[in-house]
């Protein structure tokens, strides 16, 4: 399942934005 990868990508982007 690529859900894990997608979730990590979203979390990484959120952190990068300062969230």
Curated annotation (Swiss-Prot):
Q: What is the lineage of its organism?
A: Bacteria, Pseudomonadati, Pseudomonadota, Gammaproteobacteria, Enterobacterales
Species the sequence originates in: Escherichia coli (strain K12)
- Induction statement: Identified when cells are grown in rich medium (at protein level).
Give any extra note attached to this record: This gene is entirely within the pliB gene on the other strand.
What domain of life does the native source organism fall in? Answer: Bacteria
| Protein name listed in UniProt | Protein YmgN
């Amino acid at each position: 399942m690529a859900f894990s990868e997608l979730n990590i990508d979203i979390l990484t982007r959120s952190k990068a934005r300062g969230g």
